[in-house]
Curated annotation (Swiss-Prot):
Gene3D superfamilies named in the record: 1.10.287.90, Cupredoxins - blue copper proteins
GO molecular function: copper ion binding; cytochrome-c oxidase activity
Cofactor(s) the protein needs: Cu cation
Reactions catalysed, as given in the entry: 4 Fe(II)-[cytochrome c] + O2 + 8 H(+)(in) = 4 Fe(III)-[cytochrome c] + 2 H2O + 4 H(+)(out)
Organism: Casuarius bennetti (Dwarf cassowary)
Encoding gene per record: MT-CO2
Full protein name: Cytochrome c oxidase subunit 2
Documented EC number(s): 7.1.1.9
Cofactor note: Binds a dinuclear copper A center per subunit.
Amino acid sequence: AICSLVLYLLTLMLMEKLSSNTVDAQEVELIWTILPAIVLILLALPSLQILYMMDEIDEPDLTLKAIGHQWYWTYEYTDFKDLSFDSYMVPTSELPSGHFRLLEVDHRVVVPMESPIRVIITAGDVLHSWAVPTLGVKTDAIPGRLNQTSFITTRPGIFYGQCSEICGANHSYMPIVVESTPLTHFENWSSLLSISSSL
């Protein structure tokens, strides 16, 4: 539509149907400056509102805090008392057969499927980024700042990701593994982990 209008005006100018008074008129310049500005504002305001609405989950079923360190992640399940752990990459020499090299961790993040999950992300030392592409999640972890993202898994499975911010020599050794399970399995896992951490 805009290209058509520009081509139409260009054609009129080349055919000299527009006089020099029309081309140099202040009114025309004012109109073609203000009209696009109004259109852009009318497009931007609803877009910004939708952008902020997409980032918020009204009432998540589970809130998880991910803290990036050089070169591992700490996870805290804030809805549970004393449920936290560090997650390190499993070295290739200790990797079980059939697991992915540089992607497997010693403690996976376990979440219930079909539940809104909020992840609060920060860092303890340098910039990191918590990214799980198959969940459509990538959020920067910045020291001293809390960022949040959210997701819902619709099926059980294991979702792999990595730190996607160059954070030092071992940046590629910060995998993220999210395991989505049915709610009953998640409840069993969380109670077992709570018991083992209290011992």
